[in-house]
C-alpha cells in the first residue's frame, strides 16, 4: 500500500476482516474490500474502473479462484505466497482463455531489479524512504512456536494484527 501510494498507482487491497479494512482505511488506503459475501461484484466493478491488471497474491488457496472471474481482460496474477496453506488454487481453464489471464511465480530473489545493481540500489532507496510508514509496521497478535505453523497460518486476528512465529528461548 505504501509503495502504490507513493507512486500514485491505483490499487485494491483484499482483507479477511472488517477490522483489518478499517485499520487500512484509517491509514489512508482508499480501496479496501473485505473478502466476504458479494465482494467479487465490487472487485469486478472497481478493477474495471481503475484499470487494474496485475494481482499480487500472497494467499493462494481458494481466494484466487474466487477473484479470477472478476479480473479484467489481460490480467496477470503474480503468486508470491501461500497463506492459504495447502488449499489448492482452482481456476477454470475457460477463464484463462476468455480473459487471457497469465499466472506467474514472483520472487524478489530472481527479479530483474535484484539482478541489476543499479536497479537494486534505486529500489532500496525507494523502500528506505517508506520504511517508517505505519502501514509497514507488523502489529503482533498471537505468538506461535515453529511446530505450530499450521495454527499460525489459520489464525485470523482483529484490527490487522498478525500471528507470528517465535524461536524458542535458549535461557
Regions found by a protein language model. Give the residues of each.
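Mid-domain Rossmann-like dinucleotide-binding core that forms the NAD(H)/NADP(H) cofactor-binding site
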Residues: 1-36
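Local beta-strand N-terminus motif with an aromatic residue
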Residues: 29, 51-52, 136, 149
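Short acidic-hydrophobic, aromatic-tinged amphipathic segments that line or gate anion-handling sites
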Residues: 31-38, 141-147
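N-terminal Rossmann-like NAD(P) cofactor-binding module of classical short-chain dehydrogenase/reductase
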Residues: 53-56, 78
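C-terminal capping/lid region of NAD(P)-dependent oxidoreductase domains
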Residues: 128, 134-142, 150-171
Amino acid at each position: 500500500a505504501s509503495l502504490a501510494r507513493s507512486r500514485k498507482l491505483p490499487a485494491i487491497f483484499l482483507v479477511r476482516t472488517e477490522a483489518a479494512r478499517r485499520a487500512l482505511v484509517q491509514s489512508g488506503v482508499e480501496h479496501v474490500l473485505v473478502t466476504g459475501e458479494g465482494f467479487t461484484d465490487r472487485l469486478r466493478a472497481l478493477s474495471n474502473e481503475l484499470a487494474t491488471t496485475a494481482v499480487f497474491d500472497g494467499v493462494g488457496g481458494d481466494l484466487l479462484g474466487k477473484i479470477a472471474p472478476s479480473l479484467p481482460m489481460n490480467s496477470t496474477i503474480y503468486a508470491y505466497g501461500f497463506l492459504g496453506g495447502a488449499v489448492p488454487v482452482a481456476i477454470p481453464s475457460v477463464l484463462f482463455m476468455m480473459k487471457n489471464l497469465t499466472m506467474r511465480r514472483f520472487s524478489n530473489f530472481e527479479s530483474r531489479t535484484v539482478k541489476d545493481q543499479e536497479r537494486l540500489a534505486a529500489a532500496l532507496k525507494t523502500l528506505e524512504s517508506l520504511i517508517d510508514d505505519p502501514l509497514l509496521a507488523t502489529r503482533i497478535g498471537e505468538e506461535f512456536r515453529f511446530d505450530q505453523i499450521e495454527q499460525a497460518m489459520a489464525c485470523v486476528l482483529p484490527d490487522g494484527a498478525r500471528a507470528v512465529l517465535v524461536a524458542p528461548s535458549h535461557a
